[in-house]
Amino acid sequence: MPPKKTKTSTAVAREATESPMAERSRAPDALQADPPAPTQESNNELVDSRSLEEILSGIPPPPPPAMTNEAGAPRLMITHIVNQNFKSYAGERILGPFHKRFSCIIGPNGSGKSNVIDSMLFVFGYRAQKIRSKKLSVLIHNSDEHKDVQSCTVEVHFQKIIDKEGDDFEVIPNSNFYVSRTAYKDNSSVYHISGKKATFKDVGLLLRSHGIDLDHNRFLILQGEVEQIAMMKPKGQTEHDEGMLEYLEDIIGSERLKEPIQILCRRVELLNEQRGEKLNRVKMVEKEKDALEGEKNKAIEFLTVENETFKKKNQLCQYYIHDLQKRSRDKEAQKEKIQEDTKDISEKSNTLLETMKEKNKALKDVEKQLNKITKFIEENREKFTQLDLQDVDTREKLKHSKSKVKKLQKQLQKDKEKVDELKNVPANSQKIIAEETNKKDLLEKQKEKEEEKLKNVMDSLKKETQGLQEEKEVKEKELMEISKTVNEARSKMDVAQSELDIYLSRHNSALSQLNKAKEALNTASATLKERRAAIKELETKLPKDEGDLKKREKELESLVSEEGNIKNQVRELRQKVEEARSSLSANRSRGKVLDALIQQKKSGKIPGIFGRLGDLGAIDEKYDVAISSSCGALDHIVVDTIDTAQECVNFLKKQNVGVATFIGLDKMKVWEKGLNKIQTPENIPRLFDMVKVKDEQIKPAFYFALRDTIVANNLDQATRVAFQKDKRWRVVTLQGQIIEQSGTMTGGGGKVMKGRMGSSVMVEISDDQLQKMENKLKTDTTRATEIQDRKAHLEEEVAKLRQATREMKNTFEKYTASLQSLSEQEVHLKAQVKELEVNVAAAAPDKNQQKQMEKNLETLKKEYEKVAEKAGKVEAEVKRLHKLIVDINNHKLKAQQDKLDKVTKEIDECASAITKAQVSIKTADRNLKKSEEAVARTEKEIVANDKSIEELTEDLKKLEEKATTVMNECKEAECSLPEVQEQHRSLLQEIKAIQEKEHALQKEALNIRLNIEQIDSHIAEHQSKIKYWQKEITKISLHKIEDIPEEVLPGLAQEELEAIKDPDQIINQIALLEAKSHEMKPNLGAIAEYKKKEELYLQRVAELDEITNERDSFRRAYEDLRKQRLNEFMAGFNIITNKLKENYQMLTLGGDAELELVDSLDPFSEGIMFSVRPPKKSWKKIFNLSGGEKTLSSLALVFALHHYKPTPLYFMDEIDAALDFKNVSIVAFYIYEQTKNAQFIIISLRNNMFEIADRLIGIYKTHNTTKSVATNPKIIAAKGLAEMQSVGCA
């Protein structure tokens, strides 16, 4: 949407705001002015590059109205204004509440009426100057009573309502809000919306969203400015100025189309300029195209003549091919007759082939068997290696078990020490028993005293419990005596058992250890002996086998080297033989003339012949077409001198063989200066430098044939380099197109010439030389076979020797490494055996003493069991008697019984301590038993370890047995291997014999083949000529001529070829056509140039059409937008002017006013004129009216704009100042009618105005402070009328 223009008055526009203070981050003081539109000059420079769719899509839709005139529609109203220290308002002053429709502010001059408007302007963001102050800090109240006030604040409270009948209305829920602004002493200010801090932009967006016209300020008419709306000029004089046209267009909304229209206009102008340039280019290219048409037609005529020549050449070539094919078929029939004689030789050869297949099959079977045996041997060797690894592992385990013996011995010693410690526990416990027994005795005495006291108490009860008590005392004495006996018996029995166990354990343990040590010693000694013997044997055998291995490896290395050399010789020789055969075959297929001359050279009659020039050199295949097309002398024959050339000519004439052209090398010396390399345009290659020769003296002949012809990649490059400023060059392209130094162009087309020079130099060779080479090849092939057989045999022997040597080295290293450990183990075991024998002797038990100890233990057990049984019976009887006594005396003897119980408890604790000590003795006995058991377990573990050593030793024996079995099987397989190898050699010899027979048959077939080859040479000569003429046909192609249907060379039928009797007639026709074409000298490049110009012309025309279409689319869019803008503007303009007329007639009671277009055809060119006809006067321009008439005209326009685009609020300051009382009344009544859908707040001193208002806000000033009071005149009038009526009635 186009930016808004800067306004020029408070009624129409707004000024820029003061900048805020950065330190408080407060909002700006007023609406920011939009940047000015660019000038016309800058617009012309800045061209919008967007597409048409982007420009049109960027146009916003017409702005919707913020409110409508419909009844029941919601609208905004101001409820009240709160001023705090603002201007003349000291402290907090509430103005209002305002009526929803028509409120008047009245008061004497100087009381602060206009400060109400100023407060609203302050909140709406006006500058201080517009609030009649130089700066914001001046707005803060300052009086004698209120000095040094730091800030002022104004709050304007709003709400949205829906009108109802009369003064009633409905407030829309949650629609209340207020906007406030606070100014400070430092001239900064800050905004709030409903108490939340905000920027002025937020305030502007909020108020605009509710329909307050902050852009045009139609809601605000200040004192003395009412007539300025109508006084605007018809149109702004500058880009930044605003007149009636811009003012109305802003309100109507058509101004949003102004900038897109300007953009489209500039684009149309630019596209017109570009189209003019394109049109000029089209005309220029068309002129150049027409200028080339004459040259093009001459070139087409030349190509037409050449096409006729090519057709005749095609006819002649087809005739030659037909004649040669006929001769070749005759030779083929002769060859078939000879080939029937070769059937017998073929049958013999097939028989030998079948035999060879059988022998080869048998050879494969033997090789399979040989591989199987070899694989079996390798597998067994691998098994032996695995067994060897298991042997090492087992020996390590054995070593670990032996080291474990020492650890077990240490553990056994610890367990024995613990047994000794536990044996001291009974003595300590006996000491505790003695101490607790003494204490118990003292408590027993005390108990007797307490019992005595209890006895006195029990006198009265003595008869009841006397018998039981006496019986209990007897039993307790008996129990004490028996308990001592039981404890003594049990202690004696435990001691006897421990003594017996300890006495017997030492001898058993020592004997077991001795047996294990002896067995380990025997095993270690045997192993050490075996390994020493094996090491001694290996020290003799290993060097011998290593020597044999080195000898065979050296022989094998020599054979491998010789085999590589002989294979390379055979491969190179076979390649040479093939090349010689191919060369001999090619020589046989040469032409008659060249073949006859070569035969003269070989016979020595004419030795100075070198050969055909094309055969004496070679060139990369990339340049084949180029040299074949550009060098006609490739078929010339090179000789040493001119005399030799003359001899050759005489020979050909004499023999009537044919004709040939010769090059004498003695005359070529003048060209030697051209052999050096030269500088070429763009450094492209010279064709002569690309030719390779074997004989350097041939080079001048090639330079004579080629000169300084250079090779270009394509025709464009050839055209570019052919004509230099200082020199013209002969250029040939890789496609065969030639540009002569004269400027003529030849060659090219669909068919190209190639194959006249090979990629290698041809070599002359005889049948004898070929035979010698074949014999040498045969000898070398036989030697290669012999070397291969010997190498295979040596590889087998070397593999076996390497395996055996590797195994012996591993065994030697392993046995040598184990000698030291085995020796140390043997010494250690011998010392251990001696020590254990001494221990066994010392630990041997006395048989008599052992029997005596066992007998004593059995006696003590019986005594203990007998005493324990008797004590148990007495203890049970004591408990029974005690329970009976307690049951009888419990309720009578409680106090004394408690004392007795306490003593008894202490006695029991002593008894418990004694029991614990006794239990400790018993526990010590049990722990002693456990420790002794641990000793026994350790001894068992030592036994198990010894057993493990035995088992590992047994495993070692088994592994050795398995290894022996594997080695025996391997030896058996190795014994059977020579027999199979002998079968293999025998089959190879038989196959060799068959191959010799096959070679004999091949020699026999050679004679027949030579006969066939003679026939083949004739056939090949014919086929070569056929290929030559077929190649010539491939070189012939018709030129493709623009705008003429493409022709194809015709193929002649058999009858047409037979009908040709004299080919010389065709040759003469070809000569006439070639002479005609040589005379024409056309510029063939004109066709391509004409074609390029024609394509360029069509391209330029397409570009012209494209830009024309683009120009037309922008022009249509431009016209459419202009019409849309005009239609939108005129629709709104008609509504406004009609309503203006209606309003003015009503306000003036008969006058007339209208907005008229200065230019009736284009309202945007000259603008809008405001014309008025006051009542009973003629039409006048607004400038010529009186003050009151201007005021009425302006109000009529304001109300017309309100009708077109309603705004909810209006503030007017003494708009009736220039009106008489009659017009004031008319305006007042009109405003009252207009307030049905808007809120009017008017400052007025005219009673005709404020008496009609719905609410009056009275402003008065006392003590330099403005105050206010709100009244409702209609209510007051109604009350006064009611009072008057009541008084009148009274």
Curated annotation (Swiss-Prot):
Annotated coiled-coil segments of the chain: 264-594, 764-1027, 1094-1129
Domain annotation SMC hinge: ranges: 607-721
SMART domains the UniProt entry points to: SMC_hinge
Residue ranges, compositional bias (Basic and acidic residues): 15-27
This protein's record includes keyword Membrane: no
GO BP of this protein: cell division; mitotic chromosome condensation
Single GO term (MF): ATP hydrolysis activity
Keywords for the protein's UniProt record, in alphabetical order: ATP-binding, Cell cycle, Cell division, Chromosome, Coiled coil, Cytoplasm, DNA condensation, Mitosis, Nucleotide-binding, Nucleus
Binding-site residues for ATP, renumbered to this chain: 107-114
Top-level taxon in the UniProt lineage: Eukaryota
Location relative to the cell: Nucleus; Cytoplasm; Chromosome
Role according to the record: Central component of the condensin complex, a complex required for conversion of interphase chromatin into mitotic-like condense chromosomes. The condensin complex probably introduces positive supercoils into relaxed DNA in the presence of type I topoisomerases and converts nicked DNA into positive knotted forms in the presence of type II topoisomerase.
Record's comment describing the protein's domains: The SMC hinge domain, which separates the large intramolecular coiled coil regions, allows the heterodimerization with XCAP-E, forming a V-shaped heterodimer.
Membership in a protein family: Belongs to the SMC family. SMC4 subfamily.
Binding partners and assembly: Forms a heterodimer with XCAP-E/SMC2. Component of the condensin complex, which contains the XCAP-E/SMC2 and XCAP-C/SMC4 heterodimer, and three non SMC subunits that probably regulate the complex: XCAP-H/BRRN1, XCAP-D2/CNAP1 and XCAP-G/CAPG.
Protein name, as recorded: Structural maintenance of chromosomes protein 4
Organism from which the protein derives: Xenopus laevis (African clawed frog)
Gene that encodes it: smc4
